[in-house]
Amino acid sequence: MPPPATPAQIQPPAPTVGAAPAVAAAKPLPASLARRTRIGFYGEGQLFIDAESNKTARLPELVVSIDHRPNDWLRIVAALEADDVSRLALQQAFLEASPAPVIGLRAGLLIVPLGLGNLSPEPTSYLTVDRPLTDQLIAPAVWRELGVGIFGEVGPGLRYQGQVLSGLDGTGFSAQAPLWGGRGDGGRLAVRDAAVAGRLELVDLPPGLVVGGGGYYGNATDGLRAFSGLHVGVVEADARYKKSGFDLRAEYARLYIVNSYLVNNYLGLLGQDAVPSRGYGVYVQGGYDLLQLGGLDTPQELVMFAGFENINPRSQMSQYNYNPPAITPAGQLAPEAPSPSKSLIRGGIDYRPRPSIALKADIQIEVGTEGAAPAPPMVAAGAPGTPRALGTDVADAARGGTRIGLALAFSF
């Protein structure tokens, strides 16, 4: 019997029958194939209004997935993602063999099991309009790489995952979301830059509580001699509790980029654009289903929630000097100053007429910054490359600030 599915896997329910007439020439699927194949679909539409009343509407992601089980221990999963309606890519695609609950194997394009945003990427899995910044800028969701992995359950409620993956591409690192542009997304296989990732979690001890944590470590040279010695590490811990109307969660993530000055030298990134050596994010959030107050027996939910987040993707910079030295427009040596941290408060309502549909409204307020002031603008000559542009949703998230958000999310 296969082990229980982990949150990073997409296992949508069986498709609803009769939404559209069948094509006349099409043949129905054999009964055995239909029973073993599930087709899923999830996505989200968002509207944001900032403090200056500027409005931004977007479709951050639409995902279609197929989950097929040829037999009781073999599984094939593929998910196709349209990102901001501008990029079509595989979100995950793997072959899984699970001969026993204690051990299973996967190979293909795997989701890295770090952060709640990667463990449960569906927009119906979180209450806020968009993911917390920690899950966008520190442990960037949805983070996927080519590789092989093992998973299983050992003992009551103790689950594990381990992966050997293709490494990150250091030329895609940035100041605002350090690792986001370095993800391979299955587009390349950097064998020389192999990385490892893993996760342990305790499930339902007590019922409704999931506590876990994990880590990632790997090279990010992408075969470039200029990046020799560039290493990346991420550590993360999280907790979730959902029972009796309560929806509570917390997460902490910290990233390390060893010798990040190598990227800054190669790309000519200076001052506020320089890639950091450390960054972190932490948030806590709590919600309660108001429909539970009256003791109503209904599948609907009306969750009021509030949360706090503190984040700094550039909490520490490399102490090595640039080569050649970077200078300010005034002719001074360029400091490698970290950025101040951001503190955000979010609150709102998440209404679910059914578990697969969510209508969300929230407000995000930036309540202050702490730490060093932003570094002055820098200039440098002869930069050999340019950093990879951030996605629209990640770039908007990195700016932070006060805003109101509305969303319709679904997962079938």
Predicted feature locations:
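Outer-membrane beta-barrel pore domains
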Residues: 49-51, 96-98, 118, 208-412
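Active-site rim elements
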Residues: 136, 183-187, 272
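N-terminal periplasmic/intermembrane-space "pro-region" immediately following the signal or transit peptide
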Residues: 1-48, 160, 322-325, 330-332, ...
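Charge-patterned, long linear interaction tracts outside catalytic cores
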Residues: 166-178, 188
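Outer membrane beta-barrel
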Residues: 27-170, 192-210, 283-294, 299, ...
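Loop-centered beta-sheet repeat module
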Residues: 178-226, 230
